[in-house]
């Protein structure tokens, strides 16, 4: 009973200050108690959060240590653009900026963008790609839509211009002997059978 009373008091005290300080509101998108979703209900004892799969999580305030409000005031749509080492970095950045400008020509998207695209720089020289990080400052709930739309447009534009987007692949290296030559590779080729032909051993049509 004492333990239950202690948890109840903690729920009420924490809930009181969360509501008093307006940390989160109904409809905000938050991360708390190990859950990521939209706030559907707030009480002094708990908060109800619905995730993207429709699951409703009821979280007592006593189990919440940190609250991350992802939709307070503004958001950042952050997109990392990867491309092959053979591509010119400045040219790729120019293409990305042009795509961003075209997005701002569409009123439905432009109204959600608070600041022009920022190029945050080259952040990674990976195993197979060069990565540039970009971001828009957006209205709170527009960040995810803009990220999706920006990625789609970049992919389509890269395809049009022949800019390579690398993907994981492996190069097989057979090694060399002391003479500097490699051992021959034995490759077994299988003949593709005509699907209309009879399987081996089937002489029904003969």
Question: Where do the language-model regions lie?
Answer:
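Short, structured secondary-structure boundary patches
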Residues: 9, 61-62, 81-83, 184-192
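Membrane-spanning helices that line or support transport/gating and their immediate boundary helices
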Residues: 4-19
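Residue-level signature of catalytic and energy-coupling elements of molecular machines
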Residues: 9, 27, 39, 92, ...
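Soluble accessory domains appended to multi-pass membrane transport proteins
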Residues: 16-114, 124-126, 130
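Solvent-exposed, non-transmembrane regulatory segments of membrane-associated proteins
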Residues: 1-4, 87, 97, 106-206
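Intrinsically disordered, low-complexity regions of eukaryotic proteins
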Residues: 13, 53, 204-205
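Hydrophobic side chains in well-ordered alpha-helices
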Residues: 9-12, 60, 92-95, 146, ...
């Amino acid at each position: 009973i004492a333990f239950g009373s202690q948890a109840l008091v903690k729920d009420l005290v924490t809930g009181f200050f969360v509501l008093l300080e307006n940390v989160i509101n109904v409809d905000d998108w938050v991360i708390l108690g190990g859950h990521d979703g939209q706030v559907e209900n707030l009480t002094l004892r708990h908060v109800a959060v619905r995730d993207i799969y429709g699951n409703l999580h009821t979280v007592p305030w006593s189990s919440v240590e940190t609250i991350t409000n992802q939709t307070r005031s503004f958001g950042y749509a952050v997109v990392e653009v990867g491309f092959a080492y053979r591509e010119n970095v400045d040219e790729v950045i120019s293409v990305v900026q042009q795509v961003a400008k075209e997005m701002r020509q569409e009123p439905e998207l432009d109204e959600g963008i608070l600041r022009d695209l920022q190029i945050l720089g080259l952040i990674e020289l990976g195993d197979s790609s060069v990565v540039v990080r970009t971001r828009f400052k957006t209205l709170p709930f527009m960040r995810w839509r803009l990220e999706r739309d920006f990625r789609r447009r970049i992919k389509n534009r890269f395809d049009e211009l022949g800019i390579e987007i690398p993907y994981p692949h492996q190069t097989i290296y057979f090694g060399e002997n002391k003479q500097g030559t490699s051992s021959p590779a034995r490759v077994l080729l299988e003949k593709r059978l005509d699907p209309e032909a009879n399987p081996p051993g089937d002489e029904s049509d003969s």
